[in-house]
């Protein structure tokens, strides 16, 4: 299948005719080439919708298949007319290749990360992560799935024929404006799609089917279930398989969360059922649940989908395949959750807002908004930590950590549901709830580039609900705990000539400017006499375009050179 265009098919009632679910193509191997570009689709009558996508696609991108232990090389070409990044959501990679806001890809440039796949078999994804533009770019469609395979998963007798009995489902809900353009702040979202298809159907054989569920919405949580409350067998969380499959009828996923589930269609040939969201069962305060009463002057948040049950995907059951999977194993994989007694540190994070009635943000971690120049936590390599996150706001927040997967210790002191007891990187924290997570920071240390933690409601993230941690060598007691640099460099980005504001730099006979590239390589030192000038004019046009780190009299700053 090559670049798909969602055809406009309407009924006289204005409803969408059902359309076949599109299964994204896969890319596999050890070398991957991605090209992020502008495109468009015709979802509704009238103006076409402008999108961002990867490779030949008009919306979303291919599914990347990685094998644990492989060293992979990825090339990402930016052709969107703006700066972006690509974050490998859930993957345990070095900070320099994580794709956070410190790894900008300038328009027309190519970013070439390479790393060894250290993750367990599961479903991950990739999407933009540029500061203050994540929602704008991701909501337009710049995203795709990542499947990691390993030997443990390969030994299990479970469905794994991609597109036949192993089905990727990228579920989104978005708000379009009067011109049919996706709105990054979609609090009245009502357009539900799966793999970029509105009102989709899929033909599936009468046997066990594996769904890889991703909630790629900007803010809406889904309470997944099937019509007639058909049993769901949860086999995997964000970052691994569970020890045993867990039977349930509901799987709640907030933005960024994934789950791997099985359903048994044996004996259902010629029957139909629906994947649904039972949003009427979500608690108030969870975006997608019943709309909360709003204080005067608040923006509208009354999506017609809030608090109601609705269909997402129609499943039409067809004849069973040869070699069909008709049972599931009693046990899956071994897990070794970290023990609380081995934690060296407990960090307290409070989710706050400007006042108790705030519904639309901004929201904060410990009353602080995101600052690229502030490192919130320095974490020694190989340490095990507990993070206790308390939501003191009126709305639920999906809390996401980069770099590592965590285990949920408890929710308000109670064990989490069995389906949440695998490795995770996103956890939904409801109003007035405290969730404790435990994680180990291993393999990757970097004293220049931090990792992020943030809310995965994208407009909350872009409004500053994000913090940074840096994993440092265990013996790095000399790493300075600088909360914020006392000098400023501008314009940033620039084409090469920059002005450094020295108003708050400590007075010394000489001013030492040191420049490093994004890999920590020292490029140059510039020594200037301190003539009591309040600024320093530097010509850095000899540097190639990219990300640079400055140290001025021992203080750190980041700089992006762009033409």
Where are these regions (language model features)?
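Short coil/turn motif common to extracellular beta-sandwich-like domains
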Residues: 67-71, 205-208, 381-384, 492-499
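A glycine-anchored, Pro-Gly-centered beta-turn/N-cap motif
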Residues: 122, 207, 383, 449, ...
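C-terminal outer-membrane/trafficking sorting elements
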Residues: 6, 16, 480-490, 494-563
